[in-house]
Amino acid sequence: VGLYAAFIVGLVTSVTGGRPGMISGATGALAVVMVVLVKEHGIEYLFLTVILMGIIQMAVGALKQGRLIRMVPYPVMLGFVNGLAIVIFLAQFESFKVEGANGSKSWLPSSDLAIMLGLIGITMAVIYLIPKLTTKFPSALAGILVVSGIVIFGGINTTSVGDLSSISGGLPSFGIPDVPMNMETLMIILPHAFILAAIGLIESLLTVSLIDGITETKGQNNRECLSQGAANILTGFFGGMGGCAMIGQSMINMKSGARWRLSGALAALLLLAYILFASSLIERIPIAALVGVMFVVVIGTFSWSSLRIIRKVPVADAFVMILVSAVTVATDLAIAVI
């Protein structure tokens, strides 16, 4: 359901959304809410909830309420960005662990850890070196290709994408959620739909604002609300979990020089192509290469200037910035902003 959502939401929002270059798909912040619903009522209720979530988001766009995100104060934005960077950084530590026979996780053996750290270092070095040589080839892709080549042709034993999960599958098919269409069902899904719609729009519109700052252009918030809503309605009918803007992936896209709709649409289409035809190749990519890419994203996302000015700004602003960062790390991005 996550891969289908990544394809459908990614394609629809890249073509019709209000922020060219932004990448959307299934996200962890939405999944946290969805897990509770699925455990209690089943996957079919999730699909109907995603459809209702999309309707709510489209209503926000139609009523032109997307502008409310511009009321978020600058210290909150700084705290959000720094908290995001910390969340991405901490999330990578799971890749340094291995699951034992009893299901518990422990750190990799020292030899495996050294290999992984070395590969991460090579990935990061390539990413920083490539822009000095050429700007016509995405540095993140170059890093992944170089390290994948080293691992595959060097016969290095390290964790790959395929060791964690399979990404192969087929085309999504249209279907009406198999749940009773009555008031009881509505009372079950309505609270979840409102929460998911709020989280999705907050993350998406904050990402729009973030990219606005990077590109020094202005996105269309109401159009993004309409696009996110339409994408979620569609993915609900095709058995997807819904989605919103993916901040980390959007930052990678921006750092790679993408500025137009083609990048997002191509990413979604390539994801589907990989699922259908090239899953075996993707599964051979070392996890270390992906971790290296994300570490570079962390370095580029964190507002290092905020550390220099924190003693110069009003105490209230500094407190808000630190609080938002802390809540972002402890809970999720949407709750921190609220």
What role is predicted for each listed range?
Residues 1-338:
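Transmembrane helical cores of multi-pass ion-transport proteins
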